[in-house]
Amino acid sequence: LGGYETQEGYYTKSHKYVRSTCPSGISDDLKEQFYQYGIRTVIDLRSDYELVHQPHSLKGYKDIEYYHINLLQNENMSVLPNDIKDYQDLSGFYIFMIEANKKQFKKVFNIFLNHPYDCTLFNCSAGKDRTGVIACMLLDLAGCHEYDIVKDYSESYENNMAMIKQLEDM
């Protein structure tokens, strides 16, 4: 999330917050690339079900601290395409997700606060919905322009269309 201009004329710091799909089943070389990039903290936002089916490759890697915060802890929540199709638009789903998981969102931001100097990777399965909401909140808190926040989210949506098929097959 680095390089965005804020409304005050500053820029968000690079190598601080990294939004990602789940790095499951990645090679040792790619793990090392994440490490060399500076990743020292990981926040995995996936459900328990998702963890079982796609274990996180950076969990237990070197000195990376791994946290699991299930942002779908509410039993009525799902991000599978068939389950969210009844929302008129995704904003209604996101509001419900935030309202239903306030404690989990607080835990995520406490991790950010407790790791002020670490490069933190946060991920869900596709890197779009759960991570997108967190990224929007971080960029908004940093004072970024609304159009940059929307642009950041929109790019992730386009980049992750292929992941939808994988999620449907889970």
Spans of model-derived segments:
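Ser/Thr-glycine-rich phosphate-binding loops at phosphate-binding pockets of nucleotides
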Residues: 126, 130-131
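Cys-dependent protein tyrosine phosphatase-like superfamily
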Residues: 1-121, 133-170
